[in-house]
């Protein structure tokens, strides 16, 4: 019998250990992973903070409930109910644990922010409090208020439950004897049992109600009631006034309730509660009446100061309050010499577009079906001594395409992508395809940019774990009929010892970790390999850019992710996409082989990122620590620029009257990607150019604005990204009395030009044939003029065809030209026609007709043969002849 008990005890212990291990696997794995990356303190910050808060809050809640229970003890027959003491202690432990766990796990981060708040040095216009109060402190105070209110309500319910449990036996006897339930008797018994306690709790509840309205009054700065976001005329003059009355009445009411319960008087309690209830109801009704009958008919006058607050604080919150504004008068007086003076800008004009280039990369540079290019990034590199804009993309593994898709293939053999594809943005091949500088597998590199190890273990598509240093060699890249193999030479990974095999088998619910003979003690597992998820795992409080970009530095591959601090608690700031404050305050840099990840602060003027750095002391590094070779490739990100542009559509207006009237509303310019398609928002282009009145070329991010519901451009916003001017925004305002073509309007101009439209019609053969596509529209400011650039793509028939650049359209002033290359188009655009001798027009026309017939026949033959390069060449010649004939 004793032996059976021992066996049973051991079995229970083993079962509990397995259950504990199962629950603990995620924690153990995460701890090892953070330890590997030297971020143990970041990981343990949450754990220890929750632990401290749980212990403290558990003790406070347990003691409060127990003292409350002991205060009821005087009215309990303790000898009769002494056996319930252990039950009450257990019940108190459970309740206190639940409250403590809820509080510590949900609000640990708010408490850290509260304790590590950093002033904004900007005060709100209503309560004169620093913005940091609203960002860091008010949310926590609100959470504490809700928690305490719940505990107080629980105490009332707890009292009633305790009363009925203790007196249940007597009450059942009474009901059986009298056949009725004496409500008055119960009421008096409750008063005798816990009258004083309920008086105190009820009074505290009312006291906290007054505190709740103090918090609610502060939240008026987020009111959506008026014309704008933030406290309006009605909020300040009516709602705030009534809130203050409720605060005073609730405070007085708490005293009245306490005294009345002690004296067993119900009437004063009812009067107090009814008065508070009526005040709460009156706030909504009174505010609505004032808004309808007073404010709406005098809106502009009454709301003007509050609109002023909204304009000022929205511009501050989205960092558009310090934009340099320049009046850009369009003179259209460029000469060929001006073009020569801006040669570097002209040479770097992008004639390749993102989507067609990515499509071409995936068709011709993946090499095998199991490779994929996720997206294309634009960057600038000094190539062979010359500053150049390029497209670059990582060749990553597409694990879904691996055949056979076995566990070994997915996790042990196919572990990494290989290399990059890089092409020039300013040129194409004779066929109109991207002009590659780095391509193929193994890498063919025509630049002086070296990549010693092109393997990509950490990327945008590396969503699964990989086990390296196994008995199986890793697939490196295809080489003819055979495959090149390799072995991981990085330093990352968690050792796969027996304990870790068990932990991962439990965590991943996969016995292969234990059964595979290929995984040895020397093997390591790489987890959290998706670079964005990797960053989120370490710093989930940051918001990450949708488009990480790849950088070649020191002969290695690195990923750069832009990280943002955001909030929806900035007073008076108009929300956009659920936020009303944003800063690009950090850059995350990840090694593509080792997975080493570093967070760098790039904006020390952002109080939120400074607060984060105080909370997580070992997480962030200073901007100066970023390697110089990577600094050269930092870009102002599109995500924040798009948000700023969206806000700027309305908030470029700083005059309240103009703002209220909507006199000068803008919208981001629309564009058209294919012939006769719907409009879509124009993508903001990165361009390498010299800003007007500046001496040096640099990478700029441009946004084009139209007048609202019109296709004429009103302005252009430029974001700079050199180290000295990083993030500086410049707005070029165009004259309102001139018609400035927007990207969409420019497309219509192209289609309305008789010569170009004829040629495009010949290209656009029709259903079942080739299709014409527009590229990205680039509008380049040069001196006091605008040069429009548009690439024309031709897509051949067939699902595997990729669009190819077949023409460049340039426009300046009223002139528009189409040619096969940028140089030819520029020559045609800026070279004046020389006066020639008179010719026999009739003879020339006859000869031209004959020549046109010959070229037309050749073009049709090339079309049938699928030789689109020759077809384009013949069509161009035919167009030139037709152009000559109509002169």
Curated annotation (Swiss-Prot):
It is a multi-pass membrane protein. Keywords: Cell membrane, Membrane, Transmembrane, Transmembrane helix. Coiled coil: none annotated. GO terms for cellular component: extracellular region; plasma membrane. The chain crosses the membrane at residues 9-29, 47-67, 87-107, 146-166, 195-215, 242-262, 266-286. Its main location: membrane. Pfam families: UPF0182. It is found in: Cell membrane. InterPro entries: UPF0182. Belongs to the UPF0182 family. This is UPF0182 protein CTC_00086. It comes from Clostridium tetani (strain Massachusetts / E88).
């Amino acid at each position: 019998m004793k032996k059976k008990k021992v066996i049973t005890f051991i079995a229970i212990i083993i079962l509990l250990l397995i259950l504990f291990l199962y629950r603990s696997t995620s924690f153990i794995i995460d701890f090892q992973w953070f330890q590997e990356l030297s971020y143990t303190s970041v990981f343990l910050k949450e754990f220890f903070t929750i632990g401290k808060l749980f212990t403290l809050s558990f003790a406070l809640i347990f003691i409060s409930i127990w003292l409350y229970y002991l205060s009821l003890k005087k009215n309990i027959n303790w000898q009769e109910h002494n056996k319930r003491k252990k039950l009450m202690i257990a019940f108190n432990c459970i309740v206190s644990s639940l409250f403590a766990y809820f509080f510590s796990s949900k609000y640990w981060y708010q408490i850290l922010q509260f304790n590590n708040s950093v002033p904004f040095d900007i005060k709100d216009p209503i309560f004169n409090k620093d913005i940091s109060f609203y960002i860091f402190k008010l949310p926590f105070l609100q959470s504490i208020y809700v928690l305490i209110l719940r505990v107080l309500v629980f105490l009332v319910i707890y009292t009633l439950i305790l009363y009925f449990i203790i007196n249940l036996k007597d009450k059942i006897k009474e009901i059986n004897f009298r056949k009725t339930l004496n409500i008055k008797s119960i009421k008096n018994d409750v008063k005798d049992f816990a009258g004083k306690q309920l008086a105190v709790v009820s009074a505290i509840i009312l006291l906290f109600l007054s505190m709740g309205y103090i918090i609610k009054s502060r939240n008026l700065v987020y009111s959506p009631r008026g014309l704008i976001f933030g406290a309006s005329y009605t909020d300040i003059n009516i709602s705030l006034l009534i809130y203050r009355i409720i605060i005073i009445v609730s405070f007085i009411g708490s005293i009245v309730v306490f005294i009345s319960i002690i004296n067993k008087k119900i009437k004063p309690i009812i009067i107090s509660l009814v008065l508070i209830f009526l005040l709460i109801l009156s706030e909504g009704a009174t505010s609505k009446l004032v808004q309808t009958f007073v404010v709406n008919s005098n809106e502009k006058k009454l709301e003007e100061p509050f609109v002023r607050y909204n304009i000022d604080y929205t511009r501050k919150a989205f960092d558009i309050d310090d934009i340099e504004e320049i009046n850009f008068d369009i003179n259209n007086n460029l000469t060929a010499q001006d073009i020569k003076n801006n040669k570097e800008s002209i040479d770097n004009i992008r004639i390749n577009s993102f989507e067609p280039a990515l499509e071409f990369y995936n068709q011709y540079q993946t090499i095998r079906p199991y490779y994929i290019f996720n997206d294309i990034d634009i960057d600038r590199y000094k190539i062979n001594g010359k500053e150049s804009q390029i497209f670059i993309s990582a060749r990553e593994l597409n694990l879904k395409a691996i055949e056979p898709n076995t566990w070994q293939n997915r996790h042990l053999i196919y572990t990494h992508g290989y290399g990059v594809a890089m092409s020039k943005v300013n040129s194409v091949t004779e066929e109109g395809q991207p002009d590659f500088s780095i391509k193929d597998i193994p890498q063919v590199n025509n630049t002086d940019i070296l990549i010693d190890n092109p393997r990509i273990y950490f990327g945008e598509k590396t969503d699964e774990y990989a086990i390296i240093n196994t008995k199986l060699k890793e697939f490196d890249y295809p080489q003819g009929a055979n495959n090149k193999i390799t072995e991981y030479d990085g330093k990352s990974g968690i050792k796969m010892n027996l304990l870790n095999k068990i932990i991962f088998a439990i965590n991943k619910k996969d016995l292969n970790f234990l059964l595979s003979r290929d995984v040895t003690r020397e093997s390591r597992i790489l987890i959290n390999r998706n670079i964005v998820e990797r960053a989120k795992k370490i710093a989930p409080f940051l918001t990450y850019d949708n488009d990480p970009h790849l950088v070649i530095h020191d002969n290695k591959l690195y990923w750069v992710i832009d990280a943002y601090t955001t909030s929806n608690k900035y007073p008076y700031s108009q929300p956009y996409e659920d936020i009303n404050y944003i800063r690009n305050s950090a850059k995350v840099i990840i090694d593509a082989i080792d997975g080493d990840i570093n967070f760098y602060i790039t904006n020390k003027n952002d109080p939120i990122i400074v607060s984060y750095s105080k909370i997580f002391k070992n997480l962030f590094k200073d901007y100066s620590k970023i390697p110089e070779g990577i600094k050269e490739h930092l870009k102002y990100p599109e995500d924040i620029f798009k948000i700023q542009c969206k806000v700027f559509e309305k908030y470029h207006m700083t005059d309240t009257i103009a703002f209220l009237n909507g006199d000068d509303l803008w919208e981001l310019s629309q564009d058209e990607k294919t012939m006769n398609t719907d409009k879509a928002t124009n993508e903001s282009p990165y361009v390498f150019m010299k800003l007007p009145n500046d001496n040096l070329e640099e990478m700029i991010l441009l946004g084009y604005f139209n007048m609202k519901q019109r296709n004429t451009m009103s302005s252009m916003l430029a974001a700079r990204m050199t180290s000295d001017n990083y993030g500086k925004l410049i707005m070029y305002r165009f004259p309102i009395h001139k018609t400035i073509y927007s990207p969409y309007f420019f497309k219509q101009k192209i289609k309305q030009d008789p010569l170009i439209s004829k040629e495009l019609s010949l290209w656009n053969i029709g259903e079942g044939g080739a299709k014409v596509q527009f590229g990205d529209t680039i509008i380049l400011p040069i001196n006091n003029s605008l040069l429009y650039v548009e690439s024309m793509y031709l897509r051949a028939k067939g699902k595997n065809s990729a669009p190819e650049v077949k023409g460049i359209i340039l426009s300046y002033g009223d002139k528009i030209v189409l040619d096969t290359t940028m140089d030819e188009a520029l020559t045609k655009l800026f070279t004046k026609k020389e006066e020639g001798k008179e010719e026999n027009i009739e003879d020339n026309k006859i000869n031209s007709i004959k020549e046109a017939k010959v070229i037309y026949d050749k073009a049709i033959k090339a079309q049938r043969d699928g030789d689109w390069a020759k077809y384009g060449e013949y069509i161009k010649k035919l167009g030139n002849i037709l152009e000559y004939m109509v002169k």
